Amino acid sequence: MLFKNPIIPGYNPDPSICRVGDDFYLVNSTFEFFPGVPIYHSRNLVNWELKGYCLDRRSQLELEGCRNSGGIYAPTIRFHNGMFYMITTNVTDKGNFVVHSDSVDGDWSEPAWIDQGGIDPSLFWDDDDKCYYCSTGILDGVRGIVAFEINPMTGEILSDKKLISEGCGGQCAEGPHIYKKDGMYYLMIAEGGTEYAHRAVSYTHLRAHETRSNL
């Protein structure tokens, strides 16, 4: 299929995509703008249609006093057991939170706030249906990527927090996403602070039976 970049023209930074059957859904940062976090839909990853917004009420998105490039940072969209989840950071308000909806065409929930600092949160479900949160953070004075089990409906933290990566020598480890394939866990992060040394980094972790006990 022929395509022309940009496939979604305009202001759409920090995209996150999830697949549900034959459908793809994409969200992106909106910073100081309202409504927040648009949802795009595609069947071929080339032609995209705007479906709506995750954050379209002030009770979901408080931007009073927001500076330029404040507000909503780096959302992640996920789908699990019939429910969509969007997790993000409002750097102008209370920090990290997650909202959910059983349909991208419906209303999204009120925010479930998460007691964890940092930015760029994402969610990962393991094979046992446990949900894990990861984001940037500081633990025991060490800066890196923090992870723990979470209830994604309420934001309740269900396990001890663990520092799972300090990066691999680059500046500002951020943007973490955890994936699992063939019994192996993969952590993907960005480093370099979006400047000249910016780069993507991928880690291969221990096999499933060795790793779950560590989280």
Where are these regions (language model features)?
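Beta-propeller domains
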Residues: 29-54
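Short loop/turn segments that connect beta-strands within beta-propeller blades
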Residues: 43-45, 102-104, 151-153
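Structural motif
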Residues: 35-38, 94-97, 142-146, 196-202
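Blade-loop segments of beta-propeller domains
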Residues: 50-80
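Hydrophobic core segments of beta-strands in well-ordered, beta-rich domains
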Residues: 16-33, 66, 73-91, 110-114, ...
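Surface loop/turn motifs at the tips and blade-to-blade linkers of beta-strand repeat domains
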Residues: 7-10, 67-68, 113-116, 165-170
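Conserved small/polar residues in nucleotide/adenosyl-binding loops
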Residues: 204-211
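Beta-propeller fold detector
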Residues: 50-55, 110-115, 158-164, 212-213
